[in-house]
């Protein structure tokens, strides 16, 4: 079976589908407010992606492109993707939907950063992500995990220092 990742529309139908994740998933992964704000702002460039099983949305994530001028994770500093709130509904876990969403993010060829929730580190490790050296000022209590495409590594100096040299 081929798993297809789709950009989700910013509309009330998607908002209704997100309610299922709120009912069955972790509260901190709720994207309902994010989507509501996008509807209000008429933001047609949706950062939301998902996978349908039949007509039911069973997996979803947010994917944001971060400008390289704000990169504090990767060397050389560059644009990267920030993957947020990946979630697969409980009855659909273990079928490759989470992996398909992550592979979709990797397919852009940019570094990817996410924040691992408690007990999800093993999932991210299996998908080629690694924990990055914690920086209190940068990470503010988050647990960043990153995926490095070829030729990219962890940033060891601040971009301002690297550019000044």
Swiss-Prot record:
GO terms for molecular function: acyltransferase activity, transferring groups other than amino-acyl groups. Keywords: Acyltransferase, Transferase. It is an enzyme of class 2 (transferase). Its EC number is 2.3.1.-. The keyword Acyltransferase applies. Residues 8-159 form the N-acetyltransferase domain. HAMAP family: Acetyltransf_YlbP (MF_00824). This is Uncharacterized N-acetyltransferase ABC2369.
């Amino acid at each position: 079976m081929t798993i297809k990742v789709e950009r989700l529309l910013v509309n009330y139908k998607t908002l209704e589908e997100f309610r299922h994740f709120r009912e069955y998933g972790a509260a901190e992964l709720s994207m309902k407010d994010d989507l509501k704000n996008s509807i209000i702002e008429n933001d047609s460039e949706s950062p939301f992606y998902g996978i349908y099983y039949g007509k039911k949305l069973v997996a979803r994530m947010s994917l944001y492109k971060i400008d390289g001028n704000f990169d504090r994770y990767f060397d050389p500093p560059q644009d990267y993707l920030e993957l947020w709130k990946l979630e697969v509904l409980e009855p659909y876990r273990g079928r490759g939907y989470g992996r398909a969403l992550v592979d979709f993010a990797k397919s852009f060829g940019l570094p990817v950063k996410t924040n691992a929730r408690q007990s999800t580190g093993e999932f991210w490790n299996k998908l080629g992500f690694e924990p990055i050296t914690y920086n209190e000022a940068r990470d503010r209590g988050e647990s960043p995990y990153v995926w490095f495409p070829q030729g990219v590594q962890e940033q060891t100096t601040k971009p301002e220092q690297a550019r000044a040299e």
